[in-house]
Every structure is written in structure tokens, then in C-alpha cells.
């Protein structure tokens, strides 16, 4: 009988401990916390803009009966290193000397949710390089309440518009690519900077005709408007809005074979996507791989009239962040980079053959 009583008391004691732990967790969840409502903010730095200002504000998860004091500081550089490692990006942190706060402290009045705004002023922005991406991480603190983990740091991203001063003219030119024998892309990425002078019914960017090609339009076939990006060949889909002439775009097509996910990206933003169930493709098959025109194709060569730069093919599916971060250049020795033409005048040519920057294409 005593053993039963001991077991009973042990069981009751354990239940009390569990209930106490649950109550602590519930109380922690209900406790007001301070945080940033959004974790990421994006700004474009226009030409000749040297100074920029924006408001910084934090908030409470629930109102309190007394005033809550908050303070702000620029987060340490290791925060940016961790972000880059997690998301495969290479943001550069703005120098602390470029940052000026109207005040490092603010307050949230009793019964309110939002702190009074403070102004952040950034200077020296003219020195930012076009095409590079920068970040300012700001941290919120409070001695009155706890901060909400994961949202106590806000990332403010800054970039300058693309400036392309040298590029390859494809109006009457093309590149024929012979990948090493046996090349087979399971996952892959096509990407390029393009600027269209004018649209024909069908405009070749790059790929293997009838197999896997990224192009603009198929108006002659009555399928895709002449200014819409599309994938054609064994698989087909397109975007839902047009490109414009005389404007630079970064365009990309990705396919991740393990997941079957594919996407068409413009300036790092996903414009269309689909699900495929293919093993991959041989870029040397059928007519072979072409950039700018399908030379000798009996149904029409489908030339691209305009300029291209930073033409790349990868044997991996690049992420959205990687596309955004590397529009103006990558290391030719990057893992998975199968083809790279910068087309900025830096390539060497021999006998009408342009040399690939990776050194992998003969």
C-alpha cells in the first residue's frame, strides 16, 4: 500500500511540474515583447544620391499599462556574415560612420503598440558601386521588456541600378557552344543581362533548340507574344507580362532536378514557375547549344536583336538570392559554372572563336 501511495505522490508531483512548465511557457508567450514588424526593407540608391533618410520604428506584441523604453544600435558585422552564410548572399555592410540616428532611444506610450519614429540618415552613398548590394542591420533593445527573438534585428538593403557600359552586340552575331562530350545537366541555370533593340516574332537568348531554350516570344506560332519570356523545347511555360526595348534586364531560367521546381526570373524576381519531372538534358543534342541565334535551323534562325552581357550556364540551380547578388559578375572558378561569357571586351578571340572565361569550353 505504501508503494502505491509513493507512486501516486510521484505522479501528482510530476503532473504539477509539467503544469508549472506549461504555465511558464504560456506566460512567456503572453508576455509583451518588442520587435521590428518587418525584418527586411529594400531601397534603391539613384545616381548622384549621396544622402538618404528613412524612419526606424519598433513595436510591442501587446500593449502595456506603462511606458516602454527602447533603444537602437547598428548590429555587429558578424550578423551580416551569418545572414550571407544562411542565404548564400554576399551583402556588404555599410560603414557605421555613414549612419547617423536622430536619437538612439525612443518610447512606446502606455496602451500603445508602436514606438515614436526616429530618423536614420545615411551619407556617402555616391561611393556605392552599381550592381553591388549593401546592408545596414539595426538592432532594437529594451530594459523594460524582452525582445522577440528572430525579429529584433531589421535588415535594410541598398543597391544601385545596373549600369552596363560594354556588351556584346548580337544583331548580326551568335555564339555556337560545344560543351565537353558527355555533358548532361540534371539541374541547371541559364542567366544573362539583355537589352533588346527591337522584337521579332521569336528571339533566341540561349539554349538547345527543341530541347531546352530560353527565348522571347513565339508570335509566329500564335502561342507567345513577341515580347514575353518563355521556355521552349521539351518543356514549355512563359511569363505573364512583357519586356520593354532599350532597357537592361537580368534574366534567368533555373531547374532543380531533385525537387522538380523551375523558375523564370527577371532582375532577381520570380516572374513564372512550373514543376517538371525530367532527368535533365544534353546541351549538345539536336542542333546544339546557341546564344543569340539558332544558326542553320530550317524553321528560321530566330535572331536576337540587341545586346547581351554576363552570359552564364550552370550545372546547378542558382537560388533567388544568388541571382540577385551576382548580376554583374561572378568568379570564373565558381563551383557549378559550366559556361561564362562576360562580353565586356575582356575576352580573347582566335579565328572568330571567343574564349569562355571558365576555360572549360574549347
Question: Where are the regions a protein language model picked out?
Answer:
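Short hydrophobic/aromatic patches on beta-strands that form ligand-binding or substrate-lining surfaces
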Residues: 188-198, 251-253, 291, 311-313, ...
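Extracellular/lumenal carbohydrate-interaction signature centered on repeated Trp-anchored short motifs
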Residues: 178-190, 240-249, 280-282, 301-307, ...
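Extracellular glycan-interaction surfaces
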Residues: 160-169, 195-199, 215-278
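Bacterial Sec-dependent N-terminal signal peptides
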Residues: 2-7, 12-50, 151-162
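Extracellular glycan-recognition modules
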Residues: 162-227, 318-322
Amino acid at each position: 500500500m505504501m508503494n502505491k501511495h509513493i507512486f501516486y505522490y510521484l505522479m501528482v508531483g510530476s503532473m504539477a511540474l509539467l503544469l508549472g512548465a506549461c504555465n511558464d511557457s504560456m506566460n512567456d508567450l503572453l508576455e509583451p515583447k518588442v520587435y521590428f514588424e518587418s525584418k527586411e526593407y529594400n531601397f534603391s540608391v539613384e545616381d548622384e544620391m549621396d544622402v538618404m533618410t528613412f524612419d526606424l520604428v519598433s513595436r510591442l506584441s501587446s500593449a502595456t499599462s506603462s511606458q516602454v523604453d527602447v533603444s537602437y544600435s547598428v548590429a555587429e558585422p558578424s550578423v551580416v556574415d551569418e545572414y550571407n552564410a544562411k542565404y548564400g548572399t554576399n551583402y556588404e555592410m555599410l560603414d557605421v560612420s555613414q549612419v547617423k540616428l536622430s536619437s538612439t532611444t525612443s518610447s512606446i506610450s502606455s496602451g500603445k503598440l508602436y514606438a515614436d519614429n526616429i530618423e536614420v540618415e545615411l551619407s556617402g552613398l555616391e561611393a556605392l558601386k552599381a550592381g553591388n548590394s549593401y546592408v545596414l542591420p539595426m538592432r532594437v533593445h529594451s530594459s523594460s521588456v524582452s525582445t522577440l527573438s528572430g525579429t529584433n534585428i531589421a535588415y535594410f538593403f541598398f543597391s544601385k541600378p545596373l549600369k552596363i557600359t560594354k556588351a556584346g552586340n548580337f544583331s548580326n552575331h551568335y555564339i555556337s557552344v560545344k560543351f565537353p562530350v558527355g555533358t548532361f545537366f540534371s539541374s541547371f541555370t541559364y542567366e544573362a543581362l539583355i537589352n533588346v533593340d527591337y522584337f521579332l516574332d521569336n528571339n533566341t537568348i540561349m539554349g538547345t533548340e527543341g530541347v531546352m531554350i530560353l527565348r522571347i516570344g513565339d508570335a509566329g506560332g500564335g502561342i507567345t507574344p513577341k515580347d514575353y519570356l518563355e521556355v521552349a523545347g521539351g518543356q514549355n511555360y512563359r511569363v505573364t507580362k512583357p519586356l520593354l526595348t532599350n532597357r537592361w534586364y537580368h534574366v534567368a531560367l533555373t531547374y532543380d532536378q531533385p525537387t522538380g521546381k523551375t523558375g523564370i526570373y527577371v532582375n532577381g524576381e520570380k516572374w513564372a514557375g512550373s514543376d517538371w519531372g525530367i532527368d535533365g538534358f544534353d546541351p549538345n543534342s539536336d542542333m546544339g547549344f546557341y546564344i543569340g541565334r539558332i544558326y542553320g535551323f530550317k524553321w528560321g534562325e530566330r535572331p536576337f536583336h540587341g545586346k547581351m552581357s554576363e552570359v552564364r550556364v550552370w550545372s546547378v540551380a542558382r537560388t533567388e538570392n544568388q541571382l540577385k547578388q551576382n548580376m554583374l559578375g561572378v568568379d570564373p572558378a565558381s563551383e557549378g559554372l559550366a559556361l561564362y561569357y562576360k562580353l565586356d571586351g575582356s575576352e580573347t578571340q582566335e579565328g572568330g572563336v571567343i574564349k569562355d572565361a571558365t576555360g572549360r569550353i574549347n
